[in-house]
Amino acid sequence: AVPLYWVLGRHQFKGYMERLREARATHEEAYREHMATMAPHHAVLEGDEIRYGGVLERLSERRFTEGNEVCLLIDGGQTFEAIFEAIESAESYVLVQFFIVKDDGLGNRFRELLERKSREGVRVHFLYDEIGSHKLPRRYVRSLREAGAEIHPFHSTQGPSNRFQVNFRNHRKIVVVDGRVGFVGGHNVGDEYLGVSETYGPWRDTHVRLTGPSVLSLQMVFLGDYYWATLQVPGLNWTTVTPADGS
């Protein structure tokens, strides 16, 4: 796997990281404000945490944070009930990113909710992977755009000279609402994740709901992918950390 990555995926990943640093440089003031906001919430690693956690921090170019609450969502029903509830409460923006989005029962409920919030004045920024969602019809995307949502595919390459790379995919599943609540995990947007598909039957996967400073870190992950796909940096909350819901 490592040699294959080195041959097939190395240059694209390097380009992705360069694009992320470019986004930071282009919006340096906002990035400095974000880092200043996050500094009091950085976790202090001790013992073996320094050895292993430090490696993860260097690889991700992000710090571990303290003062978060993590709510485990153990199936698709719990996951999308919580996601829909959070989106309903959105006042400023919703960030959405999934590997697979389907034009089925769940997919259309999701689309209709985002369209309604967009018409209410909430900004919607939506990324989907062009291979994972290759069956998504154009009318689905067009409907969201007509409602005012910004929806874009995550391409495997950038620039006309780059060859297509099916291996460089984006499997992230992220939702962030107003920079105050976030979701990340294993569920995509499709009926099978609710366990109602006749083809797949019962489905077991896990998501988590986050509050606290980790939400802004998750938002930064989305921003890197969004800039890669669009060369745009949307105006987001980088300076206010919403306290965790619990202790």
Language-model features and meaning:
Residues 1-247:
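N-terminal localization/anchoring segments of enzymes in phospholipid and broader phosphate metabolism
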